[in-house]
Each structure stands twice: as C-alpha cells, then as structure tokens.
Amino acid sequence: MKVSLWLTLLGVNLSLALAVGTDFPASCQAFSPDTRAANAHREFTEYVPAGTNLSLPYNDATCARPNQVVTVDLCRVALYVETSNRSSVTTEIWLPRNWTGRFLGTGNGGIDGCIKYEDLAYGAANGFAVVGSNNGHNGTTAASFYQNSDVLADFAWRALHLSTVIGKEITQAFYGEPHRKSYYLGCSLGGRQGINSAVEFPDDFDGIIAGSPAVDFNSLVSWRASFFPITGSANSTDFISVSTWKDLIHAEVLTQCDTLDCVNDGIIEDPSLCNFCPEALKCTDDRINNCLSPAQVEIVRKVFSPMYGEDGQLIFPAMQPGSELEAADQLYTGKPFRYSKEWFQYVVYNPSWDPAEFDIHDAKVADDLNPQNIRTWPNDLSNYEKRGGKIITFHGQQDGKITSFNTERFYNHLATAMNMSSSELDNFFRFFRISGMSHCSSGPGAWAFGQGGSPAPAMTPFNGNENILAALVAWVEHGVAPETITGTKYVDDNPELGISIRRSHCRFVIQLNHGRHELCY
C-alpha cells in the first residue's frame, strides 16, 4: 500500500499533540492517537519510569527477551497493523521524556520476528524517539513464510518502512512537532534492512548504520547451507569436532597469522592478509595426535574457500581465518544451519527438502527466486547520496556467521558500479573493519562502540569518537565524517569491571599500524 493510504488508515490526528513537558506521565497515559481504522489498532499506551525492569510476557519465548531494563522515563506505544488479509505487523514506539528531536528506526536479526527491545531502550536513553517491529511474524522460525508472500513482504521490506512512517507520525502527534533528523540502527539482517531502505525508501532515514550487513541475502543463505555437506554430520568418519576447531585449528590460524600486524595479541587485524595453510596440521609418522587426517585437511580447505556456482561465478566469498571460535558453534556443528534449512524448506522449496542434499544448483534456484527482491545487492545508491544521506557500515573481522569479506566485497562493488574512487564513495558511505569482533558484538577485540543495546555498547559515551551512532549524528548534522571509531573491550565484557583494552578502528581501505602507535594509514 502507498504511504499516504497507510497514514489515512492509521488516522493520526496531529491536532491531538500533547503538551508533554508539563506532566509527562499524565500526558503519556492520556495519549490516544486515533487508530480506529480496521487495519491499525492501538494495543496499549503506558508510561514507563526510569529504572523499570520491563516485563515482556507476550514476547515469543524464542526471541529470548523476557524483560528489558529501561533507564529513562518514556511513553510506550504498541500498535498492531494489518498489512493484508493474511499478514500483520506489531510495532512499538518508545517516546522518551528527554527527546532530542531525533528519530531512530531499528532492525531485526536472522530470519526472526523479534523486536530488539535492547535497541529501543538504547535509543530512548540517548534521546531518540525510537521504533521497532516484529518484522511481520513472531519468533525465530521461518515457518510463517511458507506459501505466504505477504508475510515475506513484511519481512523483506514492508515492516520496517511502514513502522518508520507510522513511528514518525506518532512522534509528531505526541511531542507536537516533527522530528528534525531520522536515523537507523541495525546489524546482520538489520544491516541488510538498512541498505535496502537506502535503495527503496531513501527519504526514510537521514543516516543509516548497517552493521555486518546480510547483503546478497540469497547467496548468504546458500553459503551457510553449504557447510553441512562440507563438514558432514557429527557421526561421520572425518567429522572435525567443535573443540578441534576452537583449540587446534584456531591456535594454528593464530600461529600463522596473528603477528602479521606486528602484535602477538590473539587478534588478526586484517584477515585478508592471512593465507592459512591447513596442511601444517596434517598427521605424519612423527605426529599422530593433535593433527588432522588428509580428508580433514581438505574439509578445512573447503571451509576457507570461496563458493562458486555452476558457471564458475562467485556466489559468496570465503570465511575469514580467525572466525573459528564462533563459526564452530554456528556452522561447523555437524548439523544444518537452521536459518538456511528453514529458508529452503519454507521459502525456496517445501518442508520435505533435505539440507544434506544441498548443492550449488540450489544456490541458483534460491537466487533466481529472489522473493520480494530480498537479495539486496544494489549497483547504485545515488538517490540516497543526492538527498544527503550518510551510511556507516561495520563488520567484525572474527565474524563466524557472515564472513567479513562480503562487506569488503560490497564496498568494492559499490565503488565499481557507481564509478567512484574510495575517497568519493567515502563522502557518503564509510566502512569500518572491527578487528577481534565476532558477529555484531563480543570477541577478544575492542568491540564495544555504541552499536546497539547490549550492556557493553550501551555503556559507550555518546560522542563521535567512541560511539558509532553519535558519529553518524555528527556526520549528518554537522558534516563531521568519522575517520576512526574507538572501540572498548571491558574486563569479562562487563563495564562494571573496568576497561581491558581500547583500540581505534580505521575506515576501509585504511589500515591500523601498530608499529606507528596505532595510527591509521
């Protein structure tokens, strides 16, 4: 549906704007935007005071978000919007007392339909009116996609766009004035959502943070599906155990590549420089323990190789060395990766599809299908650039769910397709490689830099040097583009225990030089 029609259906009456500054709790409780139209329903409005540990009893258990601590006074508005006669979106708008005039949209993850309440709390704590949705379905399964293109449309693009449009109107109705600037924050699937928004709805956001973006989505699904046939099941003869990946293989990766950056710290600054040779672990007459059979060496080689299609074209780049600690638990378990399994069963084929039979022809079928144009591999972001939009993307260099090489590939693809040099592309699109970070967060490196609502990033001071969201605000509102992002590693990832390390992360294609006092060059 067209946006104008959605606004009519929502029935927001801007004349009902409240004087929220006088008595915020009462203003919130009295706030009742008109949602009487059949397909937009206000589920509730509630005042949530600072310090509340908000219980979320109706949140699907698979989302693993039973509660959320709220650190500022806010007004919580929940809406249920029918997007067709067989699909709907649940949306929440959090309106803080300390509103700065900024609006923030948030994304989702995996194939799920889970509101990221931690990101709503993070945005509200920093003065944003913030919106999030269930992306058109509840929980972490893809089952609701089966033979339902409307639910897929919500998942691929509609839920975020619709929630953003509605969220902005609710914001104006509540505060009595429109937002000044609009931002987006998402990682993984949420990163893909951000890039897609820049392409399809360039006016939705003035600035976008697209972390570890799941771009070239269909090929990503196939790449993840490929690992089960490569590794075999856990009871197969040459299966490499999770502990072997984490201990033996990861240790050898570090032996070969850790000091390429001149520092022996368990972190590979630039995995693209690591040409890992698994043959170093091959069993010999003199080495019969803590080694790999020839078949296992070949498995490791395949894991660290790009995926090519039937005609020899690249489907997806290789997994980067150094990712073993996370990837072993996600992709090398001897079981199908669930997101890929369910995507093929409920979107590409049918529930009887056997993930053990995956081959490169399935990758072609999936990409040819490209439901709701979910691929997200644009050749052109000029419409977003021309309206003054700014994009920051980042990717952990130890990501064990989406290889960081894909974001580097995407950056280079955009530069080539748009006929831009790196300096020209960097005028509106900047990419930061985060050494020592796993998928979106965690890892041995300095991985906390304000990228979302988990405790460590949420504790990051809101300034452009240390906080990526603040850096985006500075770029959009003051024209100050980020050259580096300073990340923090807390002791045991607990901010209350103090800082372990801090490190600057450079914008691509610039690298960090440890030998020059950690200067980007």
Swiss-Prot record:
Record-listed E.C. numbers: 3.1.1.73
GO terms classed as biological process: xylan catabolic process
Residues at the active site: S188 (acyl-ester intermediate), D399 (charge relay system), H439 (charge relay system)
Reaction equations catalysed: feruloyl-polysaccharide + H2O = ferulate + polysaccharide
InterPro entries: AB_hydrolase_fold, Tannase/feruloyl_esterase
Similarity field: Belongs to the tannase family.
GO molecular function ontology, one term from the record: metal ion binding
Protein name from the UniProt record: Probable feruloyl esterase B-2
Location(s) in or outside the cell: Secreted
Residues that carry a glycan: N13, N53, N85, N98, N138, N235, N419
Disulphide bond pairs: C28-C75, C63-C114, C187-C440, C257-C274, C283-C291, C506-C520
Organism: Aspergillus flavus (strain ATCC 200026 / FGSC A1120 / IAM 13836 / NRRL 3357 / JCM 12722 / SRRC 167)
Principal cellular location given in the protein's record: secreted
Annotated Gene Ontology cellular component terms: extracellular region
Role played: Involved in degradation of plant cell walls. Hydrolyzes the feruloyl-arabinose ester bond in arabinoxylans as well as the feruloyl-galactose and feruloyl-arabinose ester bonds in pectin.
Keyword entries, A-Z: Calcium, Carbohydrate metabolism, Disulfide bond, Glycoprotein, Hydrolase, Metal-binding, Polysaccharide degradation, Secreted, Serine esterase, Signal, Xylan degradation
Record-listed Ca(2+) binding positions: D258, D261, V263, D265, I267
Signal peptide residues on this chain, from the entry's feature table: 1-19
Entry annotated with the keyword Disulfide bond: yes
